[in-house]
Amino acid sequence: MVSSIKRFLIGRPLKSTELGEQKLNKTKALAILSSDALSSVAYGPEQILIALAGLGAIAYWYSIPIAVGVLVLLTALILSYRQIIFAYPHGGGAYVVSKENLGMNPGLIAGGSLLVDYILTVAVSVSAGTDALTSAFPSLHAHNVIIAIIFVIFITILNLRGVTESASVLAYPVYLFVLALFILIGVGIYNILTGYVSPTLHTPIGTPVAGISLFLLLRAFASGSSALTGVEAISNAIPNFKDPAPNNAAKTLLAMGALLAVLFSGIVFLAYYYGVTPSKEVTVVSQIAEQTFGRNFMYYFIQGTTALILILAANTGYSAFPLLAVNLAKDKFIPRMFTIRGDRLGYSNGIIILGIASIILIVAFQGQTEHLIPLYAVGVFIPFTLSQSGMVLKWLREKPEGWALRLTVNLIGAVISFIVMSMFFLTKFAQVWSILIFLPVIIFLFHRIKKHYDAVGDQLSLKTCERIVPIEGNVIVVPVAGMTHVVENSLNYAKSLSADQVIAVYVAFDREEEKKFEEKWKKWQPEVRLVTLHSHYRSIIQPLTKFIDTVQYKASESNYRVTVVIPQFIPKKGWHNILHNQSSLLIRAYLLYKRNVVITTVPYHLKK
């Protein structure tokens, strides 16, 4: 039944030879890998206006030069990540660049930041989209958390079905959002050019503003730069592209940059010209749409596609998180299970862990994840700064043809990214301080996991000079709970191993019961030695393990190995297990950590 449900949800298993069919073309890749970046157009311009709102509407003209600054940073990031794509065509993005050029710890800081950031991407995006949806249907607002969890589960299942299938479904809402905003910007500019919009709604550029300061402008710039989250996703996901993967990834990155630049600058310009003031109740995009079209079909079309893109921005996390996890797992910094492809050739363990972690965040914050946005943004600019600094060192060290121009691009990007990151810490420390706690903890865990894998590798290697003690005999211990077919089956198996000695062990709680059992045993299995252990505290495990320790100590003197044969019956139906004591599993769990003790479980399958 479980298998049938799994097949229904994620589809039939795919052969490894079908991996090429699971690669993305540029159209689908643009949709699923740029959804996070494009969705930030819905809140990036608004963040600039919110930062300027303290000085009044007269200061809103500063949104134009600030937007130009954001576009300069966007250009530097796009050109930089394009260089990263060709320099590191196997993916890995900021983690690989930082690790190879700055050192292991900077690489782990970049990788750890991005892992957490992709979890935040899913939680924040789905929560924001759910808020947009329940704003249109207020009766659903009380169920925000449940609705958000359902969306996360839906996107998780969609990604478990395979990258091409999820792209085929999710591409439509993304391109509908792009179309909706192009129409909005086009009609808005047309209305301005034809005089339909009054020029008195906004203050002229250059109007003096009392109280303006460089610090406030940098704060607004940092807030607006939140629109650049998700730009790095394509460089992490190069392995998902069809061949030639680096060329296709680079073209997709340029297309995303161009779209983001047009949409972001268009919304900022319309918000300025329309004199839009940010409001808790109505978003900036909603106000622009209402002033442009009124409350008609186009208004609701824009609102609907905006809500969808906010939810589907989570898919960028699902595309990039598993691939980043693969790179970290290959370097032994996180569990190796992240390198295993699932039935549909995706890295399903990474997808599932991302979904679970996102749901935990949504539940913990009760769907009110807007407080995580600054943390989400600073988590992106840390790897931005590190990756571009790494590329600066790479060009200085290698000095290939045209290195000076490449160096300039990366240096500009590194400096601006560092300024933005610093502004987040200076202006929103109360919301981002936690990254200074959990990031070192994550790095510590990375190193502990790496240390464990290295230690295991050293111990398992045949090159290790470890003395092998020869096995000259075998003593078999069979824990028994009664005289049944299960025990009989295990004893027959034990006898077939040609052991030097087979010992049956019975743990009794009652003296009378103990005597009766011994008498019956002599008649049933006279050739098998029985040892009865009396348990004063009704424990099976303690007296049994103590006895096995004694046997093992005696056996080791003669280079004998102790084998414990555990009888276990297997019910016909899985749920029947909850009706029985799982003594065999407990015994096995305890004995696994005993040195020089071999454990064998002998199953006896019930027929009804």
Segments and roles (model prediction):
Residues L49-K99, G103-G111, V124-F151, G257-A261, ...:
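Extracellular loop-to-transmembrane helix junctions
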Residues M337-S348, F384-F429, Q459, K463-C465:
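C-terminal membrane-solvent junction of multi-pass transporters and transport-like membrane proteins
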Residues I155-Y190, L254-A255, I373-T385, L405-I416, ...:
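Membrane-interface loop-to-helix entry segments
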Residues N25, M104, V145-I149, K242-V262, ...:
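Loop-to-transmembrane helix boundary motifs in multi-pass membrane proteins
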Residues M1-S16, A455-G457, S461-T464, V469-K608:
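Cytosolic C-terminal regulatory domains/tails of membrane transporters and channels
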Residues L176-T203, V268-G275, T385-P400, R448-G457:
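Hydrophobic alpha-helical segments and their helix-loop junctions in multi-pass secondary transporters
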Residues Y175, A180-T229, T427, Q431:
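Helix-loop-helix junctions that connect adjacent transmembrane segments
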Residues G186-Y196, K251-Q287:
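Extracellular/periplasmic helix-exit of transmembrane alpha-helices
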